[in-house]
Amino acid sequence: MRIVLVGPPGAGKGTQATRLAETLHIPHISTGDLFRANISQQTELGKLAKSYMNAGNLVPDEVTIAMAKDRMEQPDAEGGFLLDGFPRNVSQAEALDELLETEGMKLDAVLDLEAPEDEVVKRIAGRRVCRNEPKHVFHVTYTPPKKEGVCDVCGGELYQRDDDSEETVRKRLEVYHTQTEPIIDYYKSQGLVATIAATGPVDEVTRRALEALKRDQ
């Protein structure tokens, strides 16, 4: 299956993408991973992307699309893939359609993870990360540490990342509504969108997504 996963920041896209990709035995292709891999391997595309990022500019669509194309042409993606973070706008969605068409392929489904805005803000703004090990993540409401401000695992100081402040989260949501949300209508016109409630236990959200994919087959 060839799937696109969309949803606002904090809807749990990364978590669900990993779980769905494992269940469906297809690679999880995230734009964040693509950028990191190309930059660390110093590919031509990676060098190009880094030059834009270092200048404080957005990486042009054609660079992102070229990276996605390279990844989708890898042998492990022959049987399908799950795209997370791409396409990010309508022009990228159109480019993806053209790309797939030239290969004689098409998307099977677009999963739209929906979560109320206040819930998204609460999820992200409540995150606290360990200064010693960024993988040690807690939440002031859902998974609080035993001692406030102290990592349960290593005793390191817990802090709120700048990206996780309420003001920054609301700005990111604004960008999502303006740039990314229009692709949902674009894909709805092709009959590809399944809306998934991204609230409740993680397992339940995964179950809803898999059920929606079964209905679309």
From Swiss-Prot:
Main location: cytoplasm
Record region (LID): 126-164
Entry's free-text remark on domains: Consists of three domains, a large central CORE domain and two small peripheral domains, NMPbind and LID, which undergo movements during catalysis. The LID domain closes over the site of phosphoryl transfer upon ATP binding. Assembling and dissambling the active center during each catalytic cycle provides an effective means to prevent ATP hydrolysis.
Protein's name in the database: Adenylate kinase
Enzyme class: transferase
Region (NMP): 30-59
Lineage: Bacteria, Bacillati, Actinomycetota, Actinomycetes, Kitasatosporales
Provenance organism: Streptomyces coelicolor (strain ATCC BAA-471 / A3(2) / M145)
Keywords noted in UniProt: ATP-binding, Cytoplasm, Kinase, Nucleotide biosynthesis, Nucleotide-binding, Transferase
EC number(s) reported in the record: 2.7.4.3
Catalytic activity: AMP + ATP = 2 ADP
Superkingdom as given in the UniProt entry: Bacteria
Binding, ATP: 10-15, 127, 137-138, 200
GO cellular component: cytoplasm; cytosol
